């Protein structure tokens, strides 16, 4: 149980803005800090999935700036690397002007880094005295694995350079997650879950009341007053705001704010609508967060497989837990939902992610409704196996290995002029 608690504490962290551009800003801020001055030349080398997820999303606190160059520029002039995923929380209007000036001067060059892990960012910054700093992030959004200045090593983390991103999560299983959620002392996780509920609800509120994205959440909320539609709307609304540059922080899951919101809001809606007590909501969130992490460890943090699918499926499992406390139904919910939603591709972070979240949450709820009515998909139907752990692994295998070429084609299609 201690390991599950530590896992949650390491994953459910606060982030301001979409995590891929924020990760670039973090690397850029670190490069400037080590260099000791504003660079006169910057080269940004990114894996394909980073480029894909930064291309169409608004960088927070920039008045609408988008793209790798924008994230690099604002991180360089205004970032504070000590703040991690809140690196851009102190941006001023003057900083935005300076970042735009940097973009106008065309000193930032972006290139695709091939043959690397899906989450790989390297920034090489040079000043007017030809001092050079190299900063590299790998595997997780805040993991700076290498810093050099004039080829002298300042920092290197060999462990994170070579360690698979989910190596320490091997003990995860749906059964053990269920036992943990049932029995853990809630005092160990109460503050963590309260932050998740409070922050993710706040950005969802903003998505429903402000002018963000295509207003997917608002539209769903206005169309239908059912609990199902409210769950979809509240999750989508948070993404409406986040993908369009809202600076409110969120609690993430598996490195993703959208996934953190998707894990949170459907359960908050069901708890409010059905008057569940706080303990029931907390334990349901433990199921959802850990199931999402469990599914994602086989898929990878970034891939061609849309990440909110796993979060929507996990939300269905959490709702099932709150309503039934039944392990068999939770396993069937996950299996059913994966058969409904698997296959949705990731074509980058952008406003339409809100609609994908609504689709994923709908699949999670459908999976649960099928399970509670004893109408389940059977083993042999597509990727569904006899055992839920085998099913999760089969989905992960298709997503991580089978969709590699899909990922390449999606990226090339997106960057075609």
From Swiss-Prot:
InterPro entries reported for this sequence: Ser_deHydtase-like_asu, UPF0597
Biological-process GO terms, alphabetical: L-cysteine catabolic process to pyruvate
Coiled coil region boundaries: none
GO molecular function: L-cysteine desulfhydrase activity
HAMAP family found in the cross-reference section: UPF0597 (MF_01845)
Membership in a protein family: Belongs to the UPF0597 family.
Protein name: UPF0597 protein FMG_0209
Organism: Finegoldia magna (strain ATCC 29328 / DSM 20472 / WAL 2508) (Peptostreptococcus magnus)
């Amino acid at each position: 149980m201690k390991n599950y608690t530590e896992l949650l504490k390491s994953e459910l962290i606060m982030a301001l803005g979409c995590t891929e551009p924020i990760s670039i800003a973090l690397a850029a801020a670190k490069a400037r800090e080590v260099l000791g001055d504003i660079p006169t030349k910057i080269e940004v080398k990114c894996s394909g999935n980073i480029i894909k997820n930064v291309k169409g999303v608004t960088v927070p606190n920039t008045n609408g700036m988008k793209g790798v160059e924008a994230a690099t520029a604002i991180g360089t002039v205004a970032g504070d690397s000590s703040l991690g995923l809140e690196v851009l929380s102190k941006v001023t209007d003057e900083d935005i002007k300076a970042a735009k000036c940097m973009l106008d001067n065309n000193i930032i060059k972006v290139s695709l880094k091939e043959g690397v892990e899906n989450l790989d960012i390297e920034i090489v910054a040079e000043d007017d005295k030809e001092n050079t700093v190299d900063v590299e992030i790998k595997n997780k959004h805040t993991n700076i694995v290498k810093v050099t200045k004039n080829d002298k090593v300042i920092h290197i983390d060999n462990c994170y350079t070579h360690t698979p991103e989910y190596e320490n999560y091997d003990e995860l299983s749906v059964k053990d997650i269920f036992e943990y959620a049932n029995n853990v002392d809630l005092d160990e996780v109460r503050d963590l879950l309260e932050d998740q509920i409070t922050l993710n609800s706040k950005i969802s509120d903003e998505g429903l009341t402000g002018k963000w994205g295509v207003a997917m959440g608002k539209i769903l909320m206005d169309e239908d007053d059912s609990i199902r539609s409210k769950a979809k709307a509240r999750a989508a609304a948070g993404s409406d705001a986040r993908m369009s540059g809202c600076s409110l922080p969120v609690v993430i899951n598996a490195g993703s704010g959208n996934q953190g919101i998707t894990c949170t809001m459907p359960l908050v809606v069901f708890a409010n609508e059905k008057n569940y007590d706080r303990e029931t909501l907390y334990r349901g969130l433990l199921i959802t967060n850990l199931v999402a992490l469990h599914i994602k460890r086989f898929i990878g943090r970034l891939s061609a497989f849309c990440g909110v699918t796993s979060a929507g499926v996990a939300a269905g499992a959490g709702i099932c837990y709150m309503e039934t406390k039944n392990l068999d139904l939770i396993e069937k919910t996950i299996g059913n939902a994966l058969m409904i939603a698997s296959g949705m591709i990731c074509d980058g972070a952008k406003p339409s992610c809100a609609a994908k979240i609504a689709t994923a949450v709908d699949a999670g709820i459908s999976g649960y409704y099928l399970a509670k009515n004893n109408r389940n998909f059977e083993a042999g139907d597509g990727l569904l196996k006899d055992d839920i752990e085998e099913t999760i692994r089969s989905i992960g295998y298709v997503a991580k290995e089978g969709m590699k070429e899909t990922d390449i084609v999606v990226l090339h299609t997106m960057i075609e002029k």
